[in-house]
């Protein structure tokens, strides 16, 4: 199975809460779509975008909850964007904040785009949103979740009374008028040629309260140092992808090559030119992540095994003996001081 693009696991915030609110057990859904339970609480964790949007559709259909995506946004908003949120929150204006989100949205998922249409001084500013992942059904709930999150972001950046002028969807109406009114707070149009929203030009130019240019500068520098620039070496890119792919359980040379849009043999050949092997880079990153997770006492060993891409905890035990010369429990007991 092709892994496809990834999305930041914070997009799962509130999923288990909403499922339980609707009287359903979230675990069978998470397992069916190969999403590790609890992954949304792990720093910088990513999951399969295709698995996520398919799970949203299945949840909405099987629970007979057509406004599932709109409801899920109640637990989300700007915070799901991580470091991108800090940049947006400290932009000079609402327009600047939304523009920053569009510029850096690839950090959240490379398959999502938010683009600004050209505008005149006295017109609405249009932001077009698109999920570009090929090979998946049209993500109805994914689009509605994203637009409900956009409405929350507009209120956070522009003030409690800030609202878009209009939200636009390509698909037909799914939920009730009241559901859209509560989640989006403005006119909603369906069956259009584009998905996104329009903001009044005066609201777009509104200054963001308490924005700090220095905080924005620091956050931008951090983000650009963590998410590799275009001149990063191939091995650096492989390590970065391994870090994101491990929790999906599909971290392999083939999956990494797919993310890099190259043949696995080409990947191995180019790494060999750096004196490296893909398997070794994956294992090095897995060991580093194991040490980080084992230092967090709130994580069960079974959870750590899943986050490292293992199907069984026994595989984690064997790896820890190989890496550290002791079991995971011993490693924790000794405070992370390995015998090797």
Swiss-Prot record:
Annotated HTH araC/xylS-type domain ranges read: 236-334
GO CC annotations on file: cytosol
**Induction field:** Induced at acidic pH. Negatively autoregulated.
Task: Identify the keywords attached in UniProt to this record, alphabetized.
Answer: DNA-binding, Phosphoprotein, Transcription, Transcription regulation, Virulence
Point out the DNA-binding stretch(es): 254-275, 301-324
Pfam families, alphabetized: Arabinose_bd, HTH_18
GO BP, one annotated term: cellular response to acidic pH
The knockout note for this entry states: Mutant displays altered colony morphology and cell wall structure, reduced contents and altered composition of mycolic acids along with the accumulation of saturated C24 and C26 fatty acids, and enhanced susceptibility to antibiotics, detergents and acidic pH. Also impairs ability to survive in activated macrophages, but not in resting macrophages.
Post-translational modification, as annotated: Phosphorylated by PknK. Phosphorylation increases affinity for the mymA promoter.
The GO terms describing molecular function are: DNA-binding transcription factor activity; transcription cis-regulatory region binding
Q: What superkingdom heads the lineage? A: Bacteria
* Cystine pairings recorded for this chain: none
The protein's matches in PROSITE patterns, at most eight in alphabetical order, are given as: HTH_ARAC_FAMILY_2
Task: Give a short account of what the protein does.
Answer: Regulates the expression of the mymA operon (Rv3083-Rv3089).
> What protein name is recorded for this chain?
HTH-type transcriptional regulator VirS
Species assigned in the record: Mycobacterium tuberculosis (strain ATCC 25618 / H37Rv)
Gene field = virS
